[in-house]
Amino acid sequence: MLRIADKTFNSHLFTGTGKFASSQLMVEAIRASGSQLVTLAMKRVDLRQHNDAILMPLIEAGVTLLPNTSGAKTAEEAIFAAQLAREALGTHWLKLEIHPDARWLLPDPIETLKAAEALVKQGFVVLPYCGADPVLCKRLEEVGCAAVMPLGAPIGSNQGLETKAMLEIIIQQSTVPVVVDAGIGVPSHATQALEMGADAVLVNTAIAVADDPVMMATAFRLAVEAGVLARQAVPGNRSPYASATSPLTGFLEALA
């Protein structure tokens, strides 16, 4: 079980809604993933349409919606988008995203911290997408963010946990849930993140662009479950030396 703010989730896999070939395929993949928290960009939703092709299938699927501020380049833009999302969707949950550079999509740490502090004061449950910076993640925690979402690698890059060393520090020092977001390309990346101690992962591109998104979503569900179980089982310590699993002496004498 994973608890963030006022909600509890059975699944440790969060999913996104971008890049799917159709809304039907998106919903099928989300269902196969077992995900209970789904993020969607407000810029992709037509709030004037009551039967929006992205929003309505998600509502019917019964998942918790996590609107995000993707596209915002400043704290002010993100705060405005958050207020629109709360009014339109009736949720105070928000994935805060501020990335001014369209090529790299790296989060702006200064604007993110500024917006997070303001939004928490306005009553939002803020989950900020941020760089894998232990100092920044601690500051975001201190201003009241309900979780932190450090990147594993640039958005959509499928590179995996390129920031592993920093993620380990963030996980070790955090007192709020840590959700590894961005860069996860294959199910084994997700397993590794959960084994490290991350509370959840958010996966979008790796599922959406697969030849079979539903099958890939299933693979990610199983990978996340494996990672959680492995962590709970408490793996043995790593050692630079060999450790025999069978006796090395005495067996010949026993056979004599």
From Swiss-Prot:
CDD domains found in the cross-reference section: ThiG
Annotated catalytic residues: K95 (schiff-base intermediate with dxp)
Binding site for 1-deoxy-D-xylulose 5-phosphate: G156, A182, G183, N204, T205
InterPro entries, per database record: Aldolase_TIM (IPR013785), Thiazole_synthase_ThiG (IPR033983), ThiG (IPR008867)
Main location class: cytoplasm
One cellular component (GO) term of this entry: cytoplasm
Annotated localization: Cytoplasm
Reactions it catalyzes: [ThiS sulfur-carrier protein]-C-terminal-Gly-aminoethanethioate + 2-iminoacetate + 1-deoxy-D-xylulose 5-phosphate = [ThiS sulfur-carrier protein]-C-terminal Gly-Gly + 2-[(2R,5Z)-2-carboxy-4-methylthiazol-5(2H)-ylidene]ethyl phosphate + 2 H2O + H(+)
Subunit structure: Homotetramer. Forms heterodimers with either ThiH or ThiS.
Protein name, entry field: Thiazole synthase
